[in-house]
From Swiss-Prot:
Disruption phenotype: Mutants lack FDH-N activity and exhibit defects in FDH-H activity. It comes from Escherichia coli (strain K12). The lineage of its organism: Bacteria, Pseudomonadati, Pseudomonadota, Gammaproteobacteria, Enterobacterales. Its main location: cytoplasm. The keyword Cytoplasm applies. This is Sulfur carrier protein FdhD. One of its GO terms (biological process) is Mo-molybdopterin cofactor biosynthetic process. Induction: Repressed by aerobiosis.
């Protein structure tokens, strides 16, 4: 690889996800000021030279995003199915170029779809309505969680949103231990992308999906439930509400879904047997 190209790639992967722009405040429309705004760029996931999906995302931690997306969409079963990965600039955004095993690439080609996604959209561009809600193996019941430990985690979720603290424009997804401690998290302008980044990182580091839960700062859509279940997550906590389809998918795949998570409050939609209070 040429030095100039390598330097360009390093610059791309070291982006902070924040850009300063000129803007005006309501109380002073005569004088512009600089403020931080979250970056949102098109990110294409390219498998073995073929573009599979374009998502709008924050330009950070894209390797984790690509790995998490590949796992949560059933493209791969393990990080070992990916032989290599590079993040490179393209004409209008970024590409994550992924080298899949031959077996996985053949499977991908059989069900290939092209998405032109809105921000973190998990449905845009599916070829048929039947493609929505892929079958998920029912989850086992291997753990419990004390809801009294949730409040402390909620207080620290913002720690994983440095861009969000500057801009007010990102979602977070974090892993919560049974003690309530958050031991890793990611943020993104797209809630699904933030979750994929978390799933990708934990898989890359070989962490177990047992003994813990996912906590997200957003609502719980069916895609969030499905992605979590595809990776073996048994419990999903969301700060906002759940949709009807999210509840249906969670019920079907044995995932414990909890919404409206605030200090002293939580609404359990499915499988409360994993929870105590």
């Amino acid at each position: 690889m040429k030095k100039t190209q390598r330097k360009e790639i390093e610059n791309v992967t070291n982006i902070t996800g924040v850009r300063q722009i000129e803007l005006w405040r309501r109380d002073d429309l005569q004088h512009p000021r600089l403020d931080e705004v979250a970056e949102e760029v098109p990110v294409a996931l390219v498998y073995n030279g073929i573009s599979h999906v374009v998502m709008m995302a924050s330009p950070k931690d894209l390797e984790y995003f690509a790995l998490g997306f590949s796992l949560s969409e059933g493209i791969i079963e393990s990080p070992r199915d990916i032989f290599g990965m590079d993040v490179v600039p393209s004409c209008n955004g970024l590409e994550v170029q992924i080298e899949l095993s031959s077996r996985r690439f053949m499977g991908l080609k059989e069900r290939r779809r092209a998405l032109a996604g809105r921000t973190g959209c998990g449905v845009c561009g599916v070829e048929q309505l039947n493609d929505i809600g892929k079958p998920v193996q029912p989850l086992p019941f291997t753990q419990t969680f004390d809801l009294n430990k949730l409040d402390d985690a909620l207080r620290h979720l913002n720690d994983f949103q440095p861009v969000g603290q500057l801009t007010g424009c990102t979602h977070a997804a974090a892993w919560m231990l049974p003690s309530g401690e958050l031991v890793g998290g990611h943020e993104d302008v797209g809630r699904h992308v933030a979750l994929d980044k978390l799933l990708g990182r934990r898989s890359q580091e070989g962490e177990s999906w047992q003994q813990g839960a996912v906590l997200v700062s957003s609502r719980a859509s069916y895609e969030m439930v499905q992605k979590s279940a595809m990776c073996g997550v048994e419990i999903l906590f969301a700060v906002s509400a759940a949709t009807t389809l999210a509840v249906e998918v969670a019920e079907r795949c044995n995932l414990t879904l909890v919404g409206f998570c605030k200090p002293g409050r939580a609404t359990v939609y499915t499988h409360p047997q994993r929870l105590s209070n």
